[in-house]
Regions:
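Hydrophobic-ligand binding "helix-grip"
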Residues: 44-45, 60-129
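Hydrophobic ligand-binding cavity/cleft-lining segments
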Residues: 1-52
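Hydrophobic pocket/interface hotspot
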Residues: 26, 36, 53, 86, ...
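Well-ordered beta-strand positions in beta-sheet-rich domains
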Residues: 14-16, 52, 81-83, 108-110, ...
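Residues at helix-coil transition
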Residues: 31-32, 91, 154
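Terminal "cap-and-tail" regions of soluble proteins that handle hydrophobic small molecules
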Residues: 6, 73, 77, 116-179
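Short beta-edge strand/loop motif at the mouth of beta-sheet-based domains
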Residues: 33-79, 161-167
Length: 179
């Protein structure tokens, strides 16, 4: 199984990962602010359909390795917050919510969790992306963040965030054809 995101259509990407933790543990890392903040973003989630989602990203907090913020992300160096609404919530198996989105139009992220041996199969689908640029940005971001999640669940330090992100973003720039 490739760890690369797969383009499903001109507006959708899917990532599949086998994670080294139980479904319940992975669910906690998706839904509990303190755990989610170790790999993605802190913030409140009302775990019900129609519930609010707040995600506060501070990428410098995701790694013990300090490195400069790349120029395109300098405006968000001290953090950025996005808001969404939960569209589906079936603990501990499925979580979907709207995601900020460029041009004021929200996209939608869905996490599906399935037990797999002693671990969990995670399927992450990000839909309703507005452009190829959004798709490349989201693909590089999710690939990097999922790497951090996997490392955290395995009890490892994830390594430098921005260096990994730069590499994955360049990789997806070459992989994702014009939409």
């Amino acid at each position: 199984m490739s760890e690369h995101g797969v383009v499903l259509d001109p507006t959708s990407l899917r990532f599949t990962r086998t994670l080294p933790a139980s479904v319940e543990t992975v669910w906690a890392f998706l839904t509990e602010s303190d755990k989610r903040g170790r790999w993605l973003a802190t913030g409140d989630m009302e775990l019900r359909e129609g519930g609010g989602v707040t995600l506060r990203f501070v990428h410098a907090d995701l790694s013990s390795v300090k490195e400069p913020t790349p120029e395109p992300y300098k405006p968000y160096e001290n953090g950025v917050t996005t808001h969404g609404v939960i569209t589906r919530c079936e603990p501990p198996r499925l979580l979907a919510f709207t995601w900020g989105g460029s041009q004021g139009v929200p996209s939608e992220v869905t996490f599906e969790l399935t037990p797999q041996g002693e671990g969990t199969l995670l399927v992450l689908t990000h839909r309703k992306l507005n452009s190829r640029n959004d798709m490349v940005d989201v693909a590089g971001g999710w690939h990097t963040h999922l790497g951090v999640l996997s490392a955290r669940l395995a009890g490892r330090d994830p390594g430098p965030f921005w260096s990994a992100h730069r590499g994955w973003e360049a990789d997806y720039q070459a992989r994702i054809l014009g939409a």
